[in-house]
Amino acid sequence: MHTLIERLEKVTNSKELEEARLNALGKKGVFADKFNQLKHLNGEEKNAFAKEIHHYKQAFEKAFEWKKKAIIELELEERLKKEKIDVSLFNAIKTSSSHPLNYTKNKIIEFFTPLGYKLEIGSLVEDDFHNFSALNLPPYHPARDMQDTFYFKDHKLLRTHTSPVQIHTMQEQTPPIKMICLGETFRRDYDLTHTPMFHQIEGLVVDQKGNIRFTHLKGVIEDFLHYFFGGVKLRWRSSFFPFTEPSAEVDISCVFCKQEGCRVCSHTGWLEVLGCGMVNNAVFEAIGYENVSGFAFGMGIERLAMLTCQINDLRSFFETDLRVLESF
């Protein structure tokens, strides 16, 4: 059994080490054979031989562990000599991209803030006055219906648009006012083009009566849409909103078909992007403003993002499918 340790000392690699282990400790190894011989012995001779086997087995196992450690260190040293690593090589780090909605928000803010518009933030939970009454939305208006608005038991509600921020701003400040507000809004809709939670951006400019005209509104809107969509055509249409008078909606030439007609634009060649108008005097009266004029505009951030990212299903923005989000 002395030869087992002598053989172990001559081992130079992992393969030889494993062969030495199996030869000594395997099921058909030397020590297994020695233990089988015990059944042919009796009495003191059997006990003495068993002690001798255990002694050599423990000595071999101790020598094996020492040799194993030495072999591991030796092979690691040899591998490091062969494998050269160039630490100067640049390892590109995969970076994430902005969510389409965040990108759209930032792009909008980058346009308006240099023009002097102040970003205002409001509460998601509002009362009837700020969300409806102050905006010339009477009690019988369909927007107040339980099927369209999320109500709480204490007569509070989740804001259905960002317009309440305009009301709070006018209550807290005096003209001239030049502000934008953006954030989450809530309505009870869920389909390809509607979700219970969505984002809006609204703007408001108020000054002394006569200082703000529709031409000012038209200039701001046209500059913004050309900044955001590039060289698109614009179409203004008269419309109706309770909180503006006169009111208008603005369309852009279809960014998908270039006005040749497609499913997205319903083969009209035009896409609706925002609503706007001169602030209704009823709104100013609710606030307590006198001798002022102003304009307001609003648009859906998801709507703008869908057009720039060419997304057909609005719900894609709120799902965690990285295959979709990483494509932008």
Curated annotation (Swiss-Prot):
Its EC number is 6.1.1.20. GO terms for molecular function: ATP binding; magnesium ion binding; phenylalanine-tRNA ligase activity; tRNA binding. It is found in: Cytoplasm. This is Phenylalanine--tRNA ligase alpha subunit. It holds the Pfam family tRNA-synt_2d. Disulfide bonds: none annotated. GO terms for cellular component: cytoplasm. The keyword Nucleotide-binding applies. Keywords: Aminoacyl-tRNA synthetase, ATP-binding, Cytoplasm, Ligase, Magnesium, Metal-binding, Nucleotide-binding, Protein biosynthesis. It catalyses: tRNA(Phe) + L-phenylalanine + ATP = L-phenylalanyl-tRNA(Phe) + AMP + diphosphate + H(+). Tetramer of two alpha and two beta subunits. Mg(2+) binds at residue 245. Belongs to the class-II aminoacyl-tRNA synthetase family. Phe-tRNA synthetase alpha subunit type 1 subfamily. It comes from Helicobacter pylori (strain ATCC 700392 / 26695) (Campylobacter pylori). The keyword Oxidoreductase does not apply. GO terms for biological process: phenylalanyl-tRNA aminoacylation. InterPro entries: aa-tRNA-synth_II, aa-tRNA-synth_II/BPL/LPL, Phe-tRNA-synth_IIc_asu, Phe-tRNA_ligase_II_N, Phe_tRNA_ligase_alpha1_bac, Phenylalanyl-tRNA_Synthase, tRNA-bd_arm. It comes from the Bacteria. Its cofactor is Mg(2+). SUPFAM superfamilies: Class II aaRS and biotin synthetases, tRNA-binding arm. Binds 2 magnesium ions per tetramer.
